[in-house]
Design a protein with these regions (language model features):
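A short, well-structured juxtamembrane/interface segment
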Residues: 1-10
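Glycine-rich phosphate-binding loops that contact phosphosugars or nucleotide phosphates
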Residues: 9-128, 133-141
C-alpha cells in the first residue's frame, strides 16, 4: 500500500480507470486525491481509454479498479502499459487474475458480496481501501 502511495505522489500524471460498477470506486479515489491536491484523470469508458493512449508516458500511473480483473478493459490497459512503459496498479477482488504478474501494484481486496447483491456489499470495502490509501498519502506528504 505504501508503494502505491509513493507511486501516486511521484507520478507525472495519474489515470484512474473504472467502468460500470467499478466506476464508483474510481470516482471516489479521484475526489479524495483532489482534496489532497493531487490531480487525476478519471476514465469511465473504453473510448476514453483509447483516446488517453496517445498521452500516456513512462512516468505516468494507471490505476485500474476491476472486481473480476479480467476482460477487454484490462487487455487495453495492458497494451498501453507495454507500449508506453507506464506504471499500472490493479485493485481487484480476484486473487487469480492473469494480470497479476504484469502489474506494478496488484492489490486484492476481500469480496463480501454474493453474486446477486455484490455491488452494494463490495463498495464499502473499496471505500475503506481508498481511505487507507489516502492515509498513507498523507503520512508520506507530511515527511
Amino acid at each position: 500500500m505504501r508503494r502505491l502511495a509513493e507511486s501516486i505522489i511521484h507520478a507525472r500524471r495519474i489515470y484512474i480507470v473504472g467502468v460500470i460498477n467499478s466506476f464508483v470506486s474510481a470516482m471516489q479515489l479521484r475526489h479524495a486525491l483532489l482534496m489532497y491536491g493531487i490531480d487525476a484523470t478519471l476514465i469511465s469508458g473504453y473510448d476514453e481509454l483509447h483516446a488517453v493512449d496517445m498521452c500516456v508516458g513512462s512516468d505516468d500511473l494507471i490505476i485500474v479498479y476491476s472486481v473480476s480483473a479480467n476482460g477487454k478493459l484490462l487487455k487495453m490497459v495492458e497494451d498501453m502499459v507495454e507500449q508506453d512503459q507506464c506504471h499500472k496498479a490493479l485493485i481487484t477482488m480476484n486473487p487469480f487474475s492473469s494480470f497479476k504478474d504484469t502489474s506494478d501494484h496488484y492489490i486484492v481486496l476481500p469480496k463480501a458480496g454474493t453474486p446477486q447483491n455484490s455491488l452494494l456489499q463490495d463498495i464499502p470495502i473499496v471505500s475503506v481501501f481508498n481511505e487507507i490509501l489516502i492515509s498513507y498519502l498523507t503520512q508520506i506528504k507530511e515527511r
